[in-house]
Structures are given as structure tokens and as C-alpha cells.
Amino acid sequence: NRIEQMKLEGVSFECNVKIGEDISMNRLLKDFDAIVLACGSEQPRDLKIPGRDLKGIHFAMDFLTRQNKICEGDKIEIEPEFSAKNKNVIVIGGGDTGSDCIGTSNRQGAKSVTQLEILEKPPAKENKMLTWPNWPLKLRTSSSHEEGANRNWSVSTKLFNGQKNVESLTLKKVEWKKNEEGKMVIKDSQGKESEVELKADLVLLAMGFVHPIKDKLIKDSGIKLDKRGNV
């Protein structure tokens, strides 16, 4: 057990502690010679488009953590609005978090699961001469995908449609092209067939994270943030 090993090496762990509320940053600065901030990026990227305030649209982590607690043995019930059972689920985002949402939705008994990705579909095999030493760009299919999911690439979500609850999404097919400076830019495709509407009862936003949560820890530590809110 890695934690037990670290304890034997002299590391002490204090769980369920929120810096700025349970312990002040001033106390840490006074009691310790050095402080390492390893909080990660916790603020999820939002999709602020018309209809975002409809019910049934959630950040991926709010959906996944509830299931994780059940898997750990916690006796809790998932609220109906967070359950994928018998629902048409749409996952926006093509990364690992999106893959976790697919697997969890299938296990909860989703009626259908569709994953949307704004980027182009990657090649089946990477071009090692072009990608090395960077992370290779190639199509990745997880065990969650193999369990069942529709995967759509090069689409941008433009509207969440519905009355009180989300009922469908309006999508626009997009194209990636190089501009005069040689940078890849995104443009909406034209024509009637470029716009698509998909049914949705539950939408999970899995588009990555933008920066640390700007709580009392960040403020009291006095660290500088850039224009995007990153350390």
C-alpha cells in the first residue's frame, strides 16, 4: 500500500481539510518552511450557449462522483436528474473523462449514448515521424466505447433545446483549415446537411478543465494568475 509506505517514510496525511476554511494559509506559512501547491485544475470548462440553464445538463464530474461513491460502498441514491437509466445520453468531449461517462451511462442502463467531439477524427495509426516526442495523435477506443456508444467528430453544439428539461441538441458540422499564418482554425460548415439535431434527456459536459478554483486558498496564498486564471 503506497499510503502506508509513505507514512513509514515520515509523511503525515490530514484528510477532509479545506485550506482557507479549516486551516488558514497564514498558519501554514507560519508553521512550515515551504509549501507546495498541487491542487490541480478543478474548474470545469462550461458551454455557455442558449439553453444551458435547462435541467438535465451537468458537468461530468458531478455525474461521475455520485457513481464512484456507490462503487466504494456508500449507501446513497443517485438523484433522478443524474441517473442515465432509460435516457438518451449525450457526452460532449472526447477525452478520458468523456469515456468514463460513456461506461457509467451504459452501466446505469442508458437507452442510448452518443459522444461528441469538436476535433476531426484522428487516424487509426499515428505518424511517428511527425508526432515524436509528443503524445501521438491517433484514434483511441476504450473499453467503454466497446461497450456501446455512437461517436461523432467535427461537430459543435450550438443550442440546447427543451422546455424545462433538455430534449435535444442542435449541432453544426465544422471544418478545420489552416489560415494565412498556418494555424488551424475552425469554421462552421455550410448547407442544410451541416446542421443536425439529436435527442437528449441527459447531457454531460466533459470538455476538460480551465484553471484552479479561485477559492480562499488561491487568494490567501498571494500567487499570481494570468489572464485565463491559471497559476
Give residue spans per PLM region.
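FAD-site-proximal beta/loop scaffold in flavoenzymes
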Residues: D53-N86, K178-V231
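Active-site rim loops that border cofactor/substrate pockets in soluble metabolic enzymes
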Residues: L139, H145, L169-G191
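Rossmann-like dinucleotide-binding cores of NAD(P)H-dependent redox enzymes
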Residues: N1-E4, F13, I102-L159
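Short gly/pro/ser/thr-enriched loop/turn and capping motifs at secondary-structure boundaries
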Residues: Q43-R45, L64-R66, K121-K125
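Phosphate-coordination loops involved in phosphoryl transfer and adenosine-cofactor binding
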Residues: N16, K85-N88, S154
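Feature captures the FAD/FMN-dependent oxidoreductase FAD-binding
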Residues: I3-P50, K158-E180, A200-L204, F209-L217
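Rossmann-like NAD(P)H-binding beta-loop-alpha module
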Residues: D74-A110
